[in-house]
Amino acid sequence: TPMTTRVLFDFAQQLTLLDQHELAVQFLDRTVAQGGDNHSTAYFRGNAMKFMGRMDEAEAAFEHSIALKPDYSHAHWALAFLGRKTGAEQRVERLRALLQRTTAADADRCYLDYALYRELEMLGDDEGAWQSLERGFQAKRRSVQHDAAAETALFDQIIARFPTVPRAFSTTDDAATPIFIVGMPRTGTTLLERILGNSLSITLCGELNDLRMQYKWATDNYCPGFFDEKSLARAGDADYAELGRRYLDHVKWRAPGSRR
């Protein structure tokens, strides 16, 4: 039975998350061939082309996405951040007109402001760029329901729940040993990863969700973030050796033949 366009598109999305961009494009092509040519398909195609370094095709795909859905903010944002000065004046006019008439929610509108910021910055209009960036940040902040007190309380619970590190288990001789790089954004974690990746014995895997998902499996609780109160309450009953084995089993395909 042929796959539906929805299934094909979902496969392409997952392949993109796995950095399998060439294969993702094949699924996107099949999606379009079966009648699934829409703004989302074009947008994901543009992202895949960007990651493969095929910038002309990425630009064409983002423009196609905008042609299919003129107010699709993510396509405008992605197009602007390709960093192409050619056509920037026309894109600025298009963005300003769209921002004047849009009724998009703040969560979407902020990407239009970000796009305008980037285009104006490329054109040397620093004052206009800053104003657009500020509006985008304000819109984004309005859309984020952040509770600092609740987050602090959650970290306090984590510290109280894990006063010591659970005992490690022995891996088999042929198992790769994971290296975790921990740090806040913009603190050099990516640079450190690239430095380590220069070793032939180390395979770069980027930012993975596997450990987080295995913790959810071990505590039999799903939540949007890594922890919530329910999963922390179950932390004492989790089998961490099993969690570790499952994690290694789920990521081993990423590093065939590597030691780290």
Describe the function of each predicted region.
Residues 15, 49, 82-83, 113, ...:
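Residue at a conserved register position within TPR or TPR-like alpha-solenoid repeats
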